[in-house]
């Protein structure tokens, strides 16, 4: 059994190739005849010179004929079929596997390169994250320390300021009361008992009267110690003219329901 028996199409392929060669030879002979005709025409013209346009036209005509013949040959030519023997199949398989291997190696190389770049990016981002966490921890510690310092400083500062203000107010109050006492003792003294005895309509009382300064201190202390009930009972030690003086000048107010009780006007409110 020979190769032609294994491949029945091989005889047909050989015949097609032979026919194509014969046709190509005929076309070449026709082109040769055309060239001879052109040569004869040139000989008949003699010494006449062809113009550039005629010469170019002749060359173009020849090129068109050559290209037409070549195109016709390729159109009529059928691809040669390779007999699919075991060796051929193995060779084709090896070529395909080799090509596939090269493609896969290229893809693998690309993926490895991308993975390497992603790994570098991940490491860089991780380092950045660690640095940010360290900075955040440091800032938290610093914030906590500053907060404690500010709170301690603020509390101690406020306490010292309030203490200083209270001392200043206390000193000012004592100074004001001292000045007020001196003023009241000079201008509003207690009634002279010798003068009282001369007046027939005034009975001598065994009660010790208090000064206007002492009356005001009682009213002031009551106002600040018991602000919800600042009224004071008018006792026998309060000299009535001084009580009326305080009421007439708006320094003291009577209780709306009990006229025997008075209070100091809240000038500080």
Swiss-Prot record:
GO biological process: chromosome segregation; kinetochore assembly; mitotic sister chromatid segregation
Disease link: Chromosomal aberrations involving CENPK are a cause of acute leukemias. Translocation t(5;11)(q12;q23) with KMT2A/MLL1.
Protein's gene: CENPK
Protein localization: Nucleus; Chromosome, Centromere; Chromosome, Centromere, Kinetochore
Coiled coil: 22-42, 98-151
Keywords: Centromere, Chromosomal rearrangement, Chromosome, Coiled coil, Kinetochore, Nucleus
GO cellular component terms given for this protein: cytosol; inner kinetochore; nucleoplasm; nucleus
Biased composition, class Acidic residues, residue ranges: 1-10
Residues flagged as site, Breakpoint for translocation to form KMT2A/MLL1-CENPK oncogene: 96-97
Annotated stretches, region: Disordered: 1-20
Chain's role: Component of the CENPA-CAD (nucleosome distal) complex, a complex recruited to centromeres which is involved in assembly of kinetochore proteins, mitotic progression and chromosome segregation. May be involved in incorporation of newly synthesized CENPA into centromeres via its interaction with the CENPA-NAC complex. Acts in coordination with KNL1 to recruit the NDC80 complex to the outer kinetochore.
Signal sequence, start to end: none
Taxon lineage: Eukaryota, Metazoa, Chordata, Craniata, Vertebrata
InterPro entries: Centromere_CenpK
Protein family according to the UniProt entry: Belongs to the CENP-K/MCM22 family.
Protein's name according to its UniProt entry: Centromere protein K
Nucleus found in the keyword field: yes
Any Pfam family the entry gives: CENP-K
Tissue specificity as recorded in UniProt: Detected in several fetal organs with highest levels in fetal liver. In adults, it is weakly expressed in lung and placenta.
């Amino acid at each position: 059994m020979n190769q032609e028996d294994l491949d029945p199409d091989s005889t047909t392929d050989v015949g097609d190739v032979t026919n194509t060669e014969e046709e190509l030879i005929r076309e070449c002979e026709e082109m040769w005849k055309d060239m001879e005709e052109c040569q004869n025409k040139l000989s008949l013209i003699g010494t006449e010179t062809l113009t550039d346009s005629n010469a170019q036209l002749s060359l173009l005509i020849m090129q068109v004929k050559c290209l037409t013949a070549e195109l016709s040959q390729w159109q009529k030519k059928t691809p040669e079929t390779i007999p699919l023997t075991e060796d051929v199949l193995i060779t084709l398989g090896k070529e395909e596997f080799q090509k596939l291997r090269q493609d896969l190696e290229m893809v693998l190389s690309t993926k490895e390169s991308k993975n390497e770049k992603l790994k570098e990016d991940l490491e860089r981002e991780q380092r950045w994250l660690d640095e940010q966490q360290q900075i955040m921890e440091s800032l938290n510690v610093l914030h906590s320390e500053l907060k404690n310092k500010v709170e301690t400083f603020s509390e101690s500062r406020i306490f010292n300021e309030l203490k200083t203000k209270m001392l200043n107010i206390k000193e000012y109050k004592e100074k004001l009361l001292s000045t007020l006492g001196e003023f009241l003792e000079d201008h509003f003294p207690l009634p002279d008992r010798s003068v009282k005895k001369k007046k027939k309509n005034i009975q001598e009382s065994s009660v010790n009267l208090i000064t206007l300064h002492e009356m005001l201190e009682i009213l002031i202390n009551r106002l600040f110690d018991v602000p919800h009930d600042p009224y004071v009972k008018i006792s026998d030690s309060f000299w009535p003219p001084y009580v009326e003086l305080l009421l007439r000048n708006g320094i003291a107010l009577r209780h709306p329901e009990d006229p025997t009780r008075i209070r100091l006007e809240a000038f500080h409110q």
